[in-house]
């Protein structure tokens, strides 16, 4: 029985002495820890959807620490470029801190370094940070094993060659290369379902982790006058090992398919073979050491092609349908119509559950809410329905997305997939009408509770070079209490993704102060009023 419930069954005269005398110290401590209603709700959803993936794709842990330097308590939040209020973006303090964090974490490596990203491989200043860290690790007397994994889109990434990147790393490492064992791979788990790795992780010794939306691409983030705005988070503790276990899951598939060039290209160094269980091999049966008191759910997804379903799951969802999710030519809709897909991609329901757990307000900062249609479905019906339910219940919802002016010629070719913010508000209105059965109620909920804007990071409408602001966050925050930072988008995409859900009012306050408040300060100037709402009436 949970310790905090014992007092209900024990007479008041003896309750305190009985609890103190009989409970283990750890249980007594647990009774005093803050409640975690958001994580509890999400964990229930995960156990229903994907019980068999606990410990490999998702895991809840306590005892974590948001990894910030002593002189900067919010330094666990790693933003690029970090030049709020300056359209010229002359001082990119956030980018410098992020690159320095990469180098310092890797420099501390005694045994293992795990890097994952979307292709191409980390280059420019990102590669320099990796190399500098590895050189420092070797100089300290260590011989780290290193895995670097990128997801490759068919045809688009044919020029991403692991052997070439391995050789480049060896050249830059110089004499230190002899002490570094490399596995470098690109992978595509399903060409027909457009599935490949999309996680962005740096895990060192299973003790520290950095994850979020930042890809290691110099041309998008570093060597440009219009850098992408993005965010990662850093932590230490048991949740870092959870990330390592997830990467072991991806590498297990990668190593098993390394002989199939249609799926995997692999290059190694120093005579090594493919390392499918590097994190597990290093950690063994040793429990992960706590470093703090922050509860975290680590949650990822396997996309399509790694595992068909979780056979231990008894999940039986009522899958909704909507005619406007489909386009003229489309693939099988894994997002809206595939129970088995749900069971091996627990992050999907985890994010819906996070939004559903909100009682007062939701902040969403994303590249998009709508996907590239065709070939993907236009939107996630259950996510939109969850948002509609919150709006109808009087919960305030704020959504900031990348400026639609970033839309590429083929939809996802740029940092936006929509032509207008109306695509989001119109869809929300449609789902509200379906939920309430009443146009007037739907309008009241939408006009009274929604704030919707395209992203800006200064008072100027565009960067100083005239380019639109590109936003690549994958961020959801609720009730100033819990939040998700990772690589998973809210729009349909069937990739391998990973992120952390943290419940900590103190950390959520830092997130609000350092990111959400300045974001809205500037983005509200680009706010959109949904059709049918009085000007300035929203939110």
Q: What is the meaning of each model-derived region?
A:
Residues 1-7, 37, 56:
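Coil-to-alpha-helix initiation sites in intrinsically disordered, low-complexity, charged segments
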Residues 2-30:
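Secretory targeting and sorting signals
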Residues 31-539:
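Charged, low-complexity intrinsically disordered terminal segments
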């Amino acid at each position: 029985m949970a310790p905090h419930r014992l007092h209900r069954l024990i007479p008041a005269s003896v309750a305190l002495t009985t609890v103190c005398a009989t409970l283990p110290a750890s249980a007594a401590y647990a009774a005093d820890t803050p409640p975690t209603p958001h994580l509890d709700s999400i964990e229930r959803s995960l156990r229903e959807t994907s019980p068999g993936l606990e410990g490999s794709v998702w895991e809840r842990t306590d005892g974590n620490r948001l990894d910030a330097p002593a002189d900067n308590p919010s330094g666990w939040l790693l933003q690029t470029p970090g030049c709020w209020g300056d359209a010229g973006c002359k001082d990119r303090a956030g980018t410098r801190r992020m690159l320095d964090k990469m180098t310092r974490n890797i420099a501390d490596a005694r045994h293992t370094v795990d890097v994952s990203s979307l292709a191409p491989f980390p280059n420019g200043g990102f590669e320099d940070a990796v190399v500098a860290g590895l050189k420092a690790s070797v100089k300290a007397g260590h011989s780290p094993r290193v895995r670097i994994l990128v997801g490759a889109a068919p045809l688009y990434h044919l020029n991403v060659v692991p052997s070439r990147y391995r050789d480049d790393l060896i050249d830059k490492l110089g004499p230190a290369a002899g002490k570094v064992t490399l596995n470098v791979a690109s992978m595509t788990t399903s060409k027909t379902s457009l599935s490949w790795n999309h996680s962005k992780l740096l895990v060192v010794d299973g003790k520290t982790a950095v994850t979020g939306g930042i890809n290691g691409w110099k041309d998008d983030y570093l060597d440009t006058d219009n850098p992408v705005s993005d965010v990662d988070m850093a932590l230490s503790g048991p949740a870092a090992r959870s990330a390592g276990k997830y990467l072991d899951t991806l590498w297990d598939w990668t190593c098993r398919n390394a002989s199939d060039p249609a799926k995997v290209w692999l290059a190694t160094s120093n005579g090594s073979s493919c390392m499918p269980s590097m994190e597990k091999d290093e950690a063994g049966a040793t429990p992960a050491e706590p470093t703090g008191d922050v509860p975290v759910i680590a949650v990822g997804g396997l996309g399509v092609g790694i595992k068909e379903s979780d056979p231990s799951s008894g999940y039986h969802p009522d899958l909704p349908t909507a005619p406007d999710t489909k386009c003229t030519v489309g693939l099988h809709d894994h997002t809206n119509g595939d129970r088995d897909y749900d069971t091996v991609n627990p992050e999907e329901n985890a994010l819906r559950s996070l939004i559903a757990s909100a009682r007062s307000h939701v902040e969403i900062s994303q590249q998009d809410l709508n996907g590239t249609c065709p070939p993907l479905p236009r939107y996630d019906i259950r996510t939109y329905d969850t948002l509609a339910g919150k709006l109808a219940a009087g919960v305030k919802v704020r959504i900031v997305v990348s400026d639609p002016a970033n839309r590429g010629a083929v939809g996802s070719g740029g940092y936006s997939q929509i032509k207008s913010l109306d695509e989001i508000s119109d869809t929300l209105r449609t789902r509200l009408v379906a939920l309430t059965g009443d146009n007037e109620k739907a309008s009241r909920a939408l006009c009274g509770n929604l704030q919707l804007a395209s992203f800006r990071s200064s008072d100027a409408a565009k960067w100083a070079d005239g380019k639109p602001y590109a936003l690549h966050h994958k961020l959801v925050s609720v009730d100033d209490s819990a939040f998700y930072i990772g690589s998973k988008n809210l729009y349909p995409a069937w990739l391998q993704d990973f992120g952390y859900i943290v419940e900590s009012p103190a950390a959520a306050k830092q997130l609000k102060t350092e990111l959400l408040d300045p974001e809205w300060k500037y983005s509200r100037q680009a706010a959109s009023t949904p059709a049918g709402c009085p000007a300035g009436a929203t939110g």
